[in-house]
A protein has these predicted regions:
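Short coil/turn connectors at secondary-structure junctions
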Residues: 1-2, 102-103, 130-132
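Residue-level signal for inorganic ion chemistry
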Residues: 6, 33, 90, 110, ...
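Short aromatic/hydrophobic "clamp" motif used to bind/position activated sugar donors
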Residues: 106
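Short glycine-rich anion-binding loops that position phosphate/pyrophosphate groups of nucleotides
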Residues: 10-13, 56, 82, 111-114, ...
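N-terminal glycine-rich phosphate-binding loop and ensuing alpha1 helix
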Residues: 2-59
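Conserved core of the sugar-phosphate nucleotidyltransferase
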Residues: 115-183
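Conserved N-terminal catalytic core of the sugar/cofactor nucleotidyltransferase
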Residues: 34-103
Length: 183
């Protein structure tokens, strides 16, 4: 079984939106969150989706899922105080309601990251099967530096040895559950 957990429990403070959290900002008549969900909805290898959402926005999300015919979202759980807690809330819901096997895969994805495609989801699933995990990463193109205790540039980091970790991040679900319980 391949399960997508989409976390969207944050308020988007840095975005400074006065009207709604950034995951519910609209683009072409749909929320950013729905654009993200659709990638997993339409992927043939994703069995179901769990969304961790701001508690006061769950009703809005349910209406949007219904309006656009989204069928793979099995549960919407309240988001937590942190991303980790939002993911853990979703994991607990899955564990309470599903008979999990050792080969069940979970893809963890940020609800405000809709710029993914079917191939990336497939590569994450295949990576878990081959290596035990799959973490999306891209090259570091910008110059990165370290700073000293005064905030002054100290050293330029060789970008050839740096990658930027992104989402989805994918694992065997039992391993993620165990790690979250220890955290």
């Amino acid at each position: 079984m391949n399960i997508a957990v989409i976390f969207a429990g944050g308020t988007g403070v840095r975005m400074n939106s006065q009207t709604r959290p950034k995951q519910f900002l609209e683009l072409h008549g749909k929320s950013i969150l729905l654009h993200t969900i659709e990638h997993f909805e339409f992927h043939p290898d994703i069995d179901f989706i769990v969304v961790a959402c701001l508690k006061n926005w769950i009703g809005v999300l349910k209406n949007e899922l219904y309006r656009f015919g989204i069928r793979k979202v099995k549960w919407i759980v309240p988001g937590g105080e942190t991303v980790q807690m939002s993911i853990y809330n979703a994991l607990q819901k899955i564990e309470e309601n599903e008979e999990l096997s050792d080969d069940d895969i979970i893809l963890l994805h940020d609800g405000v990251r809709p710029l993914i495609d079917q191939q990336l989801i497939s590569r994450n699933i295949e990576s878990v099967k081959k290596y035990g995990s799959g973490i999306t990463a891209t090259y570091q193109y910008e110059t990165a530096v370290t700073v000293d205790e005064n905030g002054y540039f100290d050293e330029v980091i060789d970008r050839n040895i740096v990658r930027i970790a992104k989402a989805p991040q994918s694992f065997y679900i039992k391993e993620v559950l165990e790690a979250h319980k220890k955290a």
